[in-house]
Amino acid sequence: LIDAGKKGLGPSTAQSQINDMIVEYGLAGEQVVRPKGGDPTLFARLDEEIAALEGAGVNWNIGPGITAASAASAAIGQSLTERGRNSSVRFMTGHDMKGFAEHDWRELAKPGAVASVYMGKRSARFVQGRMLMYGAARDVPITVIENATRPDQRVVTTRLDRFSQDLEDAQLTGAALTIIGLKPRAAQSLVSEAKQDVVELA
């Protein structure tokens, strides 16, 4: 077992090193399993690893997983889509290779819009500012789920106008997913069932 994990804003294994390792062991005839913390097809650098394997002539396949947005929404007792509320949901990253990621903020600011922001802790103030700039209501619910579905899961519930400050105050250190437009439906039952921390800041 080789630890090749990544930690946002912390020590991480370089992607090039991961590519080299899976190619090296694959060429040596080993059966290599590259586990991901979610679904490997979403914000997981899958294409880079496939390109390295194909370049070396190593066969590969993909085992689908459950993406963090689905796990996190289930953990707070919510559905990502609801008839009459939203007919679509966005999976978006808080930042890209150029910095904070730009999105269709006008659509995200519309009533009923739901979005899941991956790797978004550092971009909270940016997302907040953009949505307010494009006319989003100040009381849009926002939920941040740290370590979704794990025993050490924490949930921060807030609203758009207090989003960045409340997130900073919560001092989350683990991997977190932000859901815009939804708040926990069953926080109290989740506390008893999963022994999670619920930080109510709204």
Regions found by a protein language model. Give the residues of each.
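Active-site donor-binding loop signature of nucleotide-sugar glycosyltransferases
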Residues: 4-6, 93-94, 147
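Short, mixed-charge, low-aromatic patches
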Residues: 5-10, 27-28, 62-65, 80-87, ...
